């Protein structure tokens, strides 16, 4: 691989994203599809672009992503986390601004397991007094 390529692994819920960034024109490719084709929702696309817009590198880097597992929200969050890590590898001075925006911290929230005797993770069966 070329030395001008920067790598970051991002995770969110059950999704894992491998992000490769290199100097380019601003193309974002996710699983061999353009970002706009891969994510139907504008919200997901916005989440993916957030770290690039923060450091004003939207049209300076080409980003290639392979993402596995989870759904749309988890994958978008994982890609954002991976892009953030790749940006920090590119330039460590970006870390404070990315940290302040909350992109560096891995979102540790996961789906809570269903418990025995309950209908869902916390939802109890309906109580009948009589």
From Swiss-Prot:
This is Small ribosomal subunit protein uS9. InterPro entries: Ribosomal_Su5_D2-typ_SF (IPR020568), Ribosomal_uS9 (IPR000754), Ribosomal_uS9_bac/plastid (IPR023035), Ribosomal_uS9_CS (IPR020574), Ribsml_uS5_D2-typ_fold_subgr (IPR014721). Pfam families: Ribosomal_S9. GO terms for cellular component: cytosolic small ribosomal subunit. GO terms for biological process: translation. Keywords: Ribonucleoprotein, Ribosomal protein. Belongs to the universal ribosomal protein uS9 family. One of its GO terms (molecular function) is structural constituent of ribosome. It comes from the Bacteria. PROSITE patterns: RIBOSOMAL_S9 (PS00360).
